[in-house]
């Protein structure tokens, strides 16, 4: 955990990001933005990660919606997303895009 790591948490219970009403999600991310700005200006963070996990498969361990605002100081500050993109293989992108559009 880095100095200034902050959680933005809703008072009302929602299991995860997908359950939060749109008007409240905008307020949560407005607060997260203010915290990020303060981390950079006042704590002299070099950058910031904004993170929320949805369900256990994505790493959610606390089943109450929250947003991590994580100040970053350098590459050795102990936080690592370890995201290594892989080729998408045999997915048919137009079909995947069409499937996603159905849910919007």
Question: Which residue ranges define each predicted feature?
Answer:
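HIT superfamily nucleotide-processing domains
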Residues: 1-104
């Amino acid at each position: 955990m880095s100095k200034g790591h902050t959680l933005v948490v809703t008072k009302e219970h929602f299991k995860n990001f997908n359950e939060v009403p749109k008007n409240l999600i905008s307020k949560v991310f407005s607060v997260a933005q203010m915290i990020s700005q303060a981390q950079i200006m006042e704590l002299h963070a070099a950058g910031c990660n904004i993170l929320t996990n949805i369900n256990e498969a994505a790493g959610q361990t606390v089943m109450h919606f929250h947003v991590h605002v994580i100040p970053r100081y350098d590459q050795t500050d102990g936080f690592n997303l370890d995201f290594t993109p892989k080729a998408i293989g045999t997915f048919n992108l137009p079909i995947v895009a069409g499937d996603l559009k159905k849910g919007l």
